[in-house]
Amino acid sequence: MSIETLVEEIGGLTLTDAAALVKALEEKFGVSAAPAMVAGVAAAAPAAAAAEEQTEFDVVLTAAGDSKINVIKVVRAITGLGLKEAKDLVDGAPKAVKEAVSKEDAEKIVKELKDAGASVELK
């Protein structure tokens, strides 16, 4: 039996039959279909190292505050969006205003938005 034929046969199984097949294969070969937890831990380590060396940041608007109009003006200036798009972004907070910007640029954007009265996060 070719692999393609086997795949076609397995594809035709009902969910109950497929679950029974998985269980039978687990018992026959002494394995588990559950994902290995070790892989998750190993993947977390590079992510932690990357966080230490982060060079690109996302500026996230969490709330417009009391000066919504001023925040919309600043968002328009930063993003180049039209009035409606900038208003929708501000109304839809929390939303990313700028993504993957340098730390220096991100800090400038955060300062501008905070000066306008917005609540902002740097991620």
UniProtKB/Swiss-Prot annotation:
It comes from the Bacteria. Transmembrane segments: none annotated. Homodimer. Part of the ribosomal stalk of the 50S ribosomal subunit. Forms a multimeric L10(L12)X complex, where L10 forms an elongated spine to which 2 to 4 L12 dimers bind in a sequential fashion. Binds GTP-bound translation factors. The gene is rplL. PANTHER family: 39S RIBOSOMAL PROTEIN L12, LARGE RIBOSOMAL SUBUNIT PROTEIN BL12M. It comes from Chlorobium phaeovibrioides (strain DSM 265 / 1930). Forms part of the ribosomal stalk which helps the ribosome interact with GTP-bound translation factors. Is thus essential for accurate translation. GO terms for molecular function: mRNA binding; structural constituent of ribosome. Keywords: Ribonucleoprotein, Ribosomal protein. One of its GO terms (biological process) is translation. This is Large ribosomal subunit protein bL12. The keyword Ribosomal protein applies. It holds the Pfam family Ribosomal_L12_N. InterPro entries: Ribosomal_bL12, Ribosomal_bL12_C, Ribosomal_bL12_C/ClpS-like, Ribosomal_bL12_oligo, Ribosomal_bL12_oligo_N_sf. Belongs to the bacterial ribosomal protein bL12 family. GO terms for cellular component: cytoplasm; ribonucleoprotein complex; ribosome.
